[in-house]
């Protein structure tokens, strides 16, 4: 590995990383933990930019934030959803790299430092790392790469969360998060990856995901579940619309991601609704888009097994009987 920094401060003192923190209903203590986890990193004030986007919270935390650091950029806007809050942050981001952090989560210092070292010493467009619900982690010097985003997506299932990747802002161009959906990451992340020419991966668990009752991903009521499923389905169709405009290699990579999302959708319909009629309606729509039966590909053993099971009405009924409803 090179010992000379690649992305050091430029002549205009451009920050190395812009951290975009989105905040809505988290407690002040939790938000404080989030921001402190960024301040604890080995970045000087000129190397970091912290942007907190308040998406219409009942209480403004500006005084508490300024008590932590005077250079925090705080923006308050009417509630428009997570995607638009992130877009607001991107409009203000001046760093060479961008890191998204949800206000109820944290970066884990020792392992995130490994990610920072990659962008300091390698010509990376993106660093992929892992999340955890534990605060005690062990740093690993295991960076692998570089590989293009197209190649990575062709041979790997990817995680949709945009919070577990650190990316160079220049690869964004005009890409932004969709508005008004619960699955903005799933639509944004694969498109961003295809734009990356050099991806480094690490097994460092650098992002702490705090499980919270009442959060978007843990709502219990049926209406909310149905909306989640409908949004996920529309994301698949929007990604599919752009496939024909991609070069051959990028198209193959995106088709794998679409197949993965289609499998996830079918699985979630089964476990979140346990409703055969609802499942059949979803499968009919996927079929109309040429997405069901699932493509006959050797992506993973789990994918091949699930494809065989869902290809027959008997297999689908068996899944409905055996897969437990998510509680």
Please place each PLM-identified region on the residue numbering.
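Catalytic core of nucleotide-sugar-dependent glycosyltransferases
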Residues: 206-213, 219-249, 268, 273-292
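Cell-envelope/extracellular polymer assembly enzymes that use nucleotide-activated donors
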Residues: 15-18, 37, 49, 187
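Short, well-formed alpha-helical segments that are part of the catalytic scaffolds
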Residues: 2, 26-40
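Acidic donor-binding segment of Leloir-type glycosyltransferases
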Residues: 35-78
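Membrane-interface aromatic/basic loop that binds lipid-linked glycans or pyrophosphate carriers
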Residues: 1-4, 271-327
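Short aromatic/hydrophobic "clamp" motif used to bind/position activated sugar donors
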Residues: 98
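Donor-binding/catalytic cores of nucleotide-activated saccharide
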Residues: 22, 82, 102-200, 210-226
